[in-house]
């Protein structure tokens, strides 16, 4: 299972992990030619964080991303 596939199981969550999962899903649908499903975890992290403009939100998203990675690695 890839990180993208794992995150697709989290899209219905109402927390930050669900938000990140929905952003990943939306990016993949908007840019199918980029083959985003194949991105590594650091590449996804960079892509999602590039969308965040304020430091407070960036910290929140970063914490959520790190939690999602820990959950994924625990599988």
What label would you give each PLM region?
Residues 16-20, 41, 48, 75:
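Weak global preference for isoleucine
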Residues 2-6, 43-48:
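A general alpha-helix detector
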Residues 1-22, 27:
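N-terminal acidic leader/helix
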Residues 26-31, 46-75:
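Ankyrin repeat (ANK) tandem alpha-helical domains that serve as protein-protein interaction scaffolds
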């Amino acid at each position: 299972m890839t990180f993208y596939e794992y995150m697709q199981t989290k899209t219905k969550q109402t927390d930050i992990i669900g938000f990140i999962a929905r952003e990943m899903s939306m990016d993949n649908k908007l840019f199918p030619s980029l083959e985003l499903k194949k991105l590594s975890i650091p590449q996804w992290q960079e892509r999602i964080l590039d969308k965040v403009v304020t430091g407070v939100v960036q910290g929140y998203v970063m914490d959520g991303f790190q939690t999602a990675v820990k959950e994924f690695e625990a599988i």
